[in-house]
Amino acid sequence: MAAMETETAPLTLESLPTDPLLLILSFLDYRDLINCCYVSRRLSQLSSHDPLWRRHCKKYWLISEEEKTQKNQCWKSLFIDTYSDVGRYIDHYAAIKKAWDDLKKYLEPRCPRMVLSLKEGAREEDLDAVEAQIGCKLPDDYRCSYRIHNGQKLVVPGLLGSMALSNHYRSEDLLDVDTAAGGFQQRQGLKYCLPLTFCIHTGLSQYIAVEAAEGRNKNEVFYQCPDQMARNPAAIDMFIIGATFTDWFTSYVKNVVSGGFPIIRDQIFRYVHDPECVATTGDITVSVSTSFLPELSSVHPPHYFFTYRIRIEMSKDALPEKACQLDSRYWRITNAKGDVEEVQGPGVVGEFPIISPGRVYEYTSCTTFSTTSGYMEGYYTFHFLYFKDKIFNVAIPRFHMACPTFRVSIARLEMGPDEYEEMEEEEEEEEEEDEDDDSADMDESDEDDEEERRRRVFDVPIRRRRCSRLF
């Protein structure tokens, strides 16, 4: 009878051998592993088995074997100590920490000054004080990032990328939390928005909405864009850059460390290159990368400003007699409505570069569209240096430009039909007055219009408005 009772006794978790139990425990998350400590003495002992905590230390805190050796602690102690420090950010820490580690590793040999400009992480009490100052809670992923690095010193070049034209320069620094708090917005149009970046040259900032207000989603990151057609200063449109701080920061880092954003003169330039945007004619290859400039763009009126960087390279295996010089360019420019403009002119940016085997020539130019997207394509005309009478064309691949997703100001959406009609009438009257003023000197006006058109597409940057500083 006793033998039968032994054979039919139910198999419990407690009765399992140690190895199978440890295997089962290895599949548990850290929360369940901690809960097992309160079930029984045996499970408590097994849940403290140090190798079980190795996976969690690596998964949540990215702690390496080298760090463990340096700290001379067991895995469980490391997990508990780190959790006691940044445990509230456990859902964000790994993604944010990896992005920071990847970014610094990539930039150290390329932009050492930029890495040296990074500040030490902020303390919890510092972040709490900022929340008390602005009267709003900071997003947890934002706090997590600032525990690792509290922004950077306000220096050039900025960590969040640069852009340079002949008469325009932008370089965005990542603000420390105290400086950001000083620029926290309470005014209509940007209510409850905290600046993330700042450019000392243009006053441009990227903002994060710490509360949902005025049509913005909470935690959304955007460039502000004043509505120049509205009389209400609270009418501010937005170019959306990220759904959350994590989305914004990690996507930027990915573009940098993948080589998507080129490093030029120790600066990160925010040009996007489509790998398919390359054309080869004979021994010459032309590739294009583009960038949208929010500080020179507007939704109302529709004016979208883009810059592009073109690389012209001759194969190093080309014969010496293939050396040639660029004579002219031809552009076919198409906007989103299908309207086409054709332009041709001598050289590029006032130069007539010579291309020889292995040589690379790069230049930057810009264009604008009245639609949210468009594309350009065309060709260069070259002549051989050794056979000057022989000319040939080199294809420029079609490259597309599109502005980011934007959201129209709620102030405009809430505008009454009478008010909107009155505003349009005033704008039409202003345009008519401008036309009357210009009619006295029509010939000069025609020349100016032609110059404006040529400057727009003839590789000469246009001087536009600069965003005013907001703090």
Curated annotation (Swiss-Prot):
Domain F-box as annotated: residue spans: 10-56
Pfam family, any one: SMI1_KNR4
GO biological process, one term: response to lipopolysaccharide
Signal recorded as keyword: no
Region (Disordered): 419-455
UniProt-listed Gene3D superfamilies: 1.20.1280.50, ApaG domain, SMI1/KNR4-like
Compositionally biased intervals (Acidic residues): 419-451
Role summary: Substrate recognition component of the SCF (SKP1-CUL1-F-box protein)-type E3 ubiquitin ligase complex, SCF(FBXO3), which mediates the ubiquitination and subsequent proteasomal degradation of target proteins. Mediates the ubiquitination of HIPK2 and probably that of EP300, leading to rapid degradation by the proteasome. In the presence of PML, HIPK2 ubiquitination still occurs, but degradation is prevented. PML, HIPK2 and FBXO3 may act synergically to activate p53/TP53-dependent transactivation. (Microbial infection) Associates with the Rift valley fever virus NSs to form a remodeled E3 ligase that triggers efficient proteasomal degradation of targeted proteins. The filamentous E3 ligase targets the TFIIH complex leading to robust inhibition of antiviral immunity and enhances viral pathogenesis.
Name this polypeptide is given: F-box only protein 3
Organism of provenance: Homo sapiens (Human)
